[in-house]
Amino acid sequence: EIDKLNKWLFENVNNAVYRAQFAESLQAFADGYETFFTGLDAMEERLADKRFLFGDYVTDSDIRLYTTIARLDVSYSRNIGPCKHRLVDYPNLWGYARDLYQIPAFRHNTYFKDFAASVDLNEADEEYWENTYYDIVVQETDWDTIWKTPTGRESLSKDPAHKFKAEK
């Protein structure tokens, strides 16, 4: 089941946003864009009664979905044009993303400032740094405080004290 969902996530979420972003025709853009947001809609619905994609514990599928949704508002939204929805417009996905962010391995490997940069910051030329969005919005936003806001999603779990099956 995990492998099946991972394949679906790749086709309908993880790669769909890139198909829109790097499309070479309007039709290819529209296909990627619609597939991406339809995929997010499906995940929003799936997470309505589950803490994580397969219930009580984090799986590989959760990691795969998180890597895309963590970038939605700070990166992808600027690269694919007006978005149908922001992450916060999906209450289940937004709470789910923040719930995962509470886990140190997620939090310590989520680099919002890097996600917001449209180039490798180590190779950016001087002109790149004259970027209002990056200089003001990204630098002055307290991402950690926003994302560490409690979610209450533990109430969806039969084992709320544990996020990983191995912790039992």
Regions found by a protein language model. Give the residues of each.
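C-terminal alpha-helical interaction module
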Residues: 1-168
